[in-house]
Amino acid sequence: MRKRARIIYNPTSGKEQFKRELPDALIKLEKAGYETSAYATEKIGDATLEAERAMHENYDVLIAAGGDGTLNEVVNGIAEKPNRPKLGVIPMGTVNDFGRALHIPNDIMGALDVIIEGHSTKVDIGKMNNRYFINLAAGGQLTQVSYETPSKLKSIVGPFAYYIKGFEMLPQMKAVDLRIEYDGNVFQGEALLFFLGLTNSMAGFEKLVPDAKLDDGYFTLIIVEKSNLAELGHIMTLASRGEHTKHPKVIYEKAKAINISSLTDLQLNVDGEYGGKLPANFLNLERHIDVFAPNDIVNEELISNDHVDDNLIEE
């Protein structure tokens, strides 16, 4: 019996490239043995609703084609359900943090090859209050860059748009008083930023979590304490090389459960999109989603040795 795949795609991502190549993508998957159909989103929330519908119709594979926001919506549509379908990813956004972390090719046909080859691995996801995320949750003024950067600027200069907007915001940054409880520990004090990471790639920084494991059941918690502009600039430079973890203004920890609160009105960034405001409870859901990935992520030590799946090893 042929497997059934449903593509959920954002037609505006990647300068509408996927929309143009959709017929070729459908043919490629059909030739590989998948009975395939597609759905184009029109507004925020569409991908979640369509993922839920596809679950009810018992699709074997869901393929998210778009940016990290589209992928986040698809995950939110299946995370609470039993017998979740395998997830394929076609990175079409500006940064594509999750795709980078899993070494998924940025070209459409290359990403489809990963799905067709059939290797998959189970990865952790995060639950924040009543919603889910697959890559990061963050707070602090600088973390608003991804959803405050104009779409036109992103279409012109791509990922560099975030750096342009980020440097524009640096002088305006202010520390806020936070209480962060994590696995029996407490941080109470002023901080500029905090990140909860599930992969090594966050906000375009591919070495922000140099020791990342995608399936160990832990968030990486990064807190940047109150710093002056020069210190913050130095931390960002170190972060581009993965050398920030020992900086005296950086707290770098692992935790399964985290609670964050503040008397300040602080917005959250969840997988690159606006995620509401504090307070927030975070829980790591270990190995919750099965994702198609290239076989080489095992060699990159992104998967825990005791969790290597049989279908991620060449026979």
Swiss-Prot record:
Residue ranges constituting the DAGKc domain according to the UniProt record: 1-132
A single cellular component GO annotation: plasma membrane
Top enzyme category: transferase
Keyword Amino-acid biosynthesis listed: no
A UniProt-annotated Pfam family: DAGK_cat
EC number(s) stated in the UniProt entry for this protein: 2.7.1.107
NCBIfam families hit by this protein: PRK13055.1, PRK13337.1, YegS/Rv2252/BmrU family lipid kinase
Subunit structure: Homodimer.
Family membership noted in the UniProt record: Belongs to the diacylglycerol/lipid kinase family.
Record protein name field: Diacylglycerol kinase
Originating gene: dagK
